[in-house]
Design a protein with these regions (language model features):
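Patatin-like phospholipase
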Residues: 1-41, 46-279
Length: 279
């Protein structure tokens, strides 16, 4: 019986993870009521939080595909000044808005703390971020940061530099945990999760990507991110991971990200691709 789930970071590739989870849910591979711990970085943490809500997976998939995600990003006249002064052009509001409807559907709101979220779900959610001052990985959970807001924890784990404005908490900035731990399988193993009770989704995004000379600054940041995550993934190659799905995919790029934000059909195709991969 699966009791622990590990979800890799990967920006919009998280749609593939949704597809995998939908297939496995429909085929009773896991029962969310039996899950005890979820480990996720960046988009993996976002998906993990949604799983903790225990909403019917069909409703989740419908929400992810049908929502007009392009309305979440506002390109105001101040976007350039915000980029320079606030170190990014997307702020925490995007995380609050993305989660608000899902939270309200189970009578929760965006002010819920990690402790209260655990009391609701009875699932130990672990999210990973990096404190910029000492560049150390932080494990965000109800045990380590009980009073931290759920939306803050998710945003901290997703904050890719130059794109997301890093959250400042008590004088410390936090960025995407994927630069150190994009695939937190080792933390699941360290918590003594039994081999037959853990399941993990990872990405092999070593496929085609733009040449460096053709990349803009944001794609260049994602390239660095990809290279670091591949390096950290290699460190896990000697681990004994029985129930693991590794999805082959191309490197991240802004063109695909932009198209997915605006196209419902493309989001559906990514989810279906993950679904088919799990079969």
């Amino acid at each position: 019986m699966i009791k622990n789930i590990v979800l890799s970071g990967g920006a919009y590739l998280g749609l593939l993870e949704f597809g995998v989870l939908q297939y496995l849910n429909e085929n009773l591979y896991y029962d969310i009521s039996e899950i005890e711990k979820i480990y996720g970085t960046s988009i993996g943490g976002f998906i993990g939080a949604i799983l903790c809500l225990k909403i019917d997976m069909k409703d989740v998939i419908e929400y992810i595909t049908d929502r007009p995600w392009h309305n979440l990003i506002s390109f105001s006249p101040s976007i350039l000044s915000d980029f320079y002064s606030k170190k990014g052009f997307i702020n925490k509001n995007i995380c609050e808005i993305a989660l608000s409807n899902l939270l309200r559907s189970v009578d929760l709101d965006t002010n819920i703390t990690l402790k209260n979220f655990y009391e609701y779900s009875n699932i130990e959610l672990h999210l990973y971020t990096i404190s910029l001052g000492d560049f150390e990985l932080k494990d965000l959970s109800y045990k380590t940061y009980p009073d931290l807001l759920l939306v803050d924890a998710i945003y901290m784990s997703c904050s890719v530099p130059y794109i997301f404005q890093p959250l400042n908490i008590e004088g410390e900035y936090y960025i995407d945990g994927g630069f150190i731990c994009n695939y937190p399988i080792s933390y699941c193993i360290k918590d003594n999760a039994k081999e037959d009770e853990r399941f993990a989704i990872a990405f092999n995004n070593s496929g085609k990507t733009k040449h460096i000379s053709e990349q803009n600054i944001f794609e260049f940041v994602y390239l660095i991110h990809n290279k670091l995550t591949q390096f950290t993934r290699q460190k896990n190659n000697n681990l004994n991971i029985k129930n693991e799905i590794i999805i082959d995919c191309d490197g991240l790029n802004l063109e695909d990200a932009h198209n997915l934000i605006f196209s419902k059909e493309l989001r559906q195709s990514y989810i279906k691709r993950g679904y088919d991969f799990a079969e």
